Swiss-Prot record:
Function field: Fimbriae (also called pili), polar filaments radiating from the surface of the bacterium to a length of 0.5-1.5 micrometers and numbering 100-300 per cell, enable bacteria to colonize the epithelium of specific host organs.
Classification via InterPro entries: CssA/B, Fimbrial_Assembly_Comp
Name recorded for this polypeptide: CS6 fimbrial subunit A
Signal peptide span: 1-18
Subcellular localization: Fimbrium
Taxon lineage: Bacteria, Pseudomonadati, Pseudomonadota, Gammaproteobacteria, Enterobacterales
Gene designation per UniProt: cssA
The entry's keywords: Fimbrium, Signal
Source superkingdom: Bacteria
Coiled coil regions, renumbered to chain: none
Main location: other
Pfam families tied to this protein: CssAB
GO cellular component terms given for this protein: pilus
Length: 154
C-alpha cells in the first residue's frame, strides 16, 4: 500500500509543476546569426545591332539590381574565367563562335576576382563586347554561353 501512495504523490507533484530550485548560474552565449543571401536573377538582353562582327561591338548586356550589403559585383564568362573571355557558340554550327569580354559601366574589364564598386539597390549594367580583332562576318542564329555573377561584401 505504501508504494501506491508514493507513486500518487509523485504524479501529483508533476501535475502541479511543483519543483524545488537547487541552484542557478548564468552562462554567456555567443552565436553568429547570418542573413540568408538570395542572389537576384540578372536580366540578359541581346543586342540587335548590325555591326556585331566588329571588334568592340555590343553583343549583349547584363542588368541587375544590387542586393543589400553588397559592395562589389562582377560578371564574367565561364569559358575562360582567368582571362575574362567568353565564347558565344552558334547552336546550329559549333564552328561559328564569337570571343567576347565583359566590361562594367566605366569600361573596366570584369574578371573572376575583380568587380565593380557598387551601392545597394543600384541598377548596374555590364556589357559583353566582341573581342575578335578586326571585322568578322557573323552568321545569324542563336549563340550560347554562360556567365557567372559574383557578389562581394566588405
Amino acid at each position: 500500500m505504501k508504494k501506491t501512495i508514493g507513486l500518487i504523490l509523485i504524479l501529483a507533484s508533476f501535475g502541479s509543476h511543483a519543483r524545488t530550485e537547487i541552484a542557478t548560474k548564468n552562462f554567456p552565449v555567443s552565436t553568429t546569426i547570418s542573413k540568408s543571401f538570395f542572389a537576384p536573377e540578372p536580366r540578359i538582353q541581346p543586342s540587335f545591332g548590325e555591326n556585331v562582327g566588329k571588334e568592340g561591338a555590343l553583343l549583349f548586356s547584363v542588368n541587375l539590381t544590387v542586393p543589400e550589403n553588397v559592395s562589389q559585383v562582377t560578371v564574367y564568362p565561364v569559358y575562360d574565367e582567368d582571362y575574362g573571355l567568353g565564347r558565344l557558340v552558334n547552336t546550329a554550327d559549333a564552328s561559328q563562335s564569337i570571343i567576347y569580354q565583359i566590361v562594367d559601366e566605366k569600361g573596366k574589364k570584369m574578371l573572376k576576382d575583380h568587380g565593380a564598386e557598387v551601392t545597394p539597390n543600384q541598377q548596374i549594367t555590364f556589357k559583353a563586347l566582341n573581342y575578335t580583332s578586326g571585322e568578322k562576318k557573323i552568321s545569324p542564329g542563336i549563340y550560347n554561353d554562360q556567365v557567372m555573377v559574383g557578389y562581394y561584401v566588405n
